[in-house]
Amino acid sequence: MPEQDHLTMTDIVVSPHFDDGALSVASTLSKGPSALLLTVCGGAPTGAGDDEWDRLCGFESGPAAASGRAAEDRAAAALAGHDVVHLPIPDAPYRTAFPTAAVTAALAPLLRPDVRVWAPVGIGSHPDHVGTRDAVLTAAAGTGCQLLFYADCPYAFGSGWDAADRDRPPADRWEPQLAALAHLVDVDCPRITRLDDSTMRLKIAMLRCHASQLAGLSVDHPHFMAWEGPLRQEVFWPASVLAPSLEPTLGSSA
């Protein structure tokens, strides 16, 4: 659990992987000590196998990737001044079903009516992103916390922020994932945040801490780190009501 008194936290960013918070919600993480970044897939796999992405990023094994990326995340957090929590859950390539029950149990003690909880929409259709979203929905039910859903970067801007959904690759389309949240958010009225220079400077510095990921991300998203590039924008959908008693609409196995 977080090092600081969790009663002082106003914002909890729930990130599927180590770099997703910095990529998508830097405007909130820039608040420093009042924010907490909780990474769901923050654990090492039990075996010594490897994944193609981890190999591309320079890691010889899954455990090496988990250790190295956790260190990168702590370095990024030190720049912004926020605390981090890494749940002991490995990435999707190293497990079978998403552990919804374990994630829900870890989140539950942190959720209060005066806390804003930031969760991924699930754009990109990655099982860890969709599973994280659904676990947040389950954990938040009945707590009264304020839910906000963020556009998952880089999937969300891969074809351009303003692209028509039909022109995006099927997995990166926004509409199917937003449809799962239509009972909570106004799908057609996102909150668009353009980062000021100070926050953009911090965001770039945080992402440079996640150095292992940059080469791989640049293959499909060249120049995404440009000063006036797509990272300058962040997109959110606030829930129109406080977290009600509800069931996730696109659940993952517990």
Regions found by a protein language model. Give the residues of each.
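The feature marks non-catalytic terminal segments
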Residues: P2-E3, R69-L87, A92-F98, G142-A254
